[in-house]
Amino acid sequence: MKSKIIALGDSIIKGVILNIESNGKLHYALSDCNIVDQVANKTNHEVVNLGKMGCTIEAGERILDRHLAGIENAEYALLCYGGNDSDYNWRAIAQSPKGEHQPKTPISVFEKTYARIIDKVRQAGLTPIVMSMPAMDAERYYQFFTSVFSDEEKRNVSRWLKNGTDAIWAGHELYNDAIKRVAAATDAMLVDVSKAFSQPEKYLCVDGIHPSRAGQKTIASAIAHAIV
């Protein structure tokens, strides 16, 4: 009987990619070679993918709580959070750049909740595997999310950022560092997939944040190597 991996996280775990249609329109879809399925094939495990697009760490804890009773026969819990937690409501910033704007999950809440999730999966008998966020292309992401904004809204976002897209990258790295701190503090296995994205433009979709099929393959190989 194969061992089982429970995967919890956001759209990266879910396997979401951004496709470009023949007419140039963009749409999100599920990859036919997502990370979790590739890890299962490489390590001879069964998988239960509980990933959800847009999932923050607090929403992830609620999903885990609903499924705790059914995961006790699994071996690993693959965890991937941070991309949505570290992000902002860019539409709100575009419309009110002088207002108070914070990431979707305060970093202190993010760290405490992540540590609690790790403890819960351990209590259920699983080995937690904490995945860092892959590197992002901040400039590409900026161009993507502002593409639907008016010129005035784009100027508002640009003024709010002050340091340009470097500020987006810095926020991303702040939460990536938090992930590594939590993994170290809880003595959880860390798979730092950001190291595999030395040239993120080769491994990301046009939105600058979701791994392409090539990126998913790279991440899956890093995770499988850590498990085997």
Question: Which role does the model predict for each range below?
Answer:
Residues S11, I17, M53-T56, N84-D85, ...:
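Gly/Ser/Thr-rich beta-alpha loop segments that engage phosphate groups in nucleotides
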Residues I6, I12, V48-G51, I57, ...:
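Generic detector of intrinsically disordered, low-complexity, polar/charged segments
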Residues C55-L64:
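Structural motif
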Residues H45-E46, G51-T56, P134, F197:
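Short, solvent-exposed turn/loop segments enriched in Gly/Ser/Thr/Pro and often Arg
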Residues D65-V228:
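Alpha-helical cap/lid subdomain in secreted, periplasmic
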Residues D32, G60, T113-Y114:
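Amphipathic coiled-coil/heptad-repeat helices and related helical stalk/stem segments
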Residues A29, I57, E100:
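Short gly/ser-rich anion-binding loops that grip negatively charged ligand groups
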Residues M1-G51, H67-N73, A77:
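Serine-esterase "nucleophile elbow" of acetyl-processing enzymes
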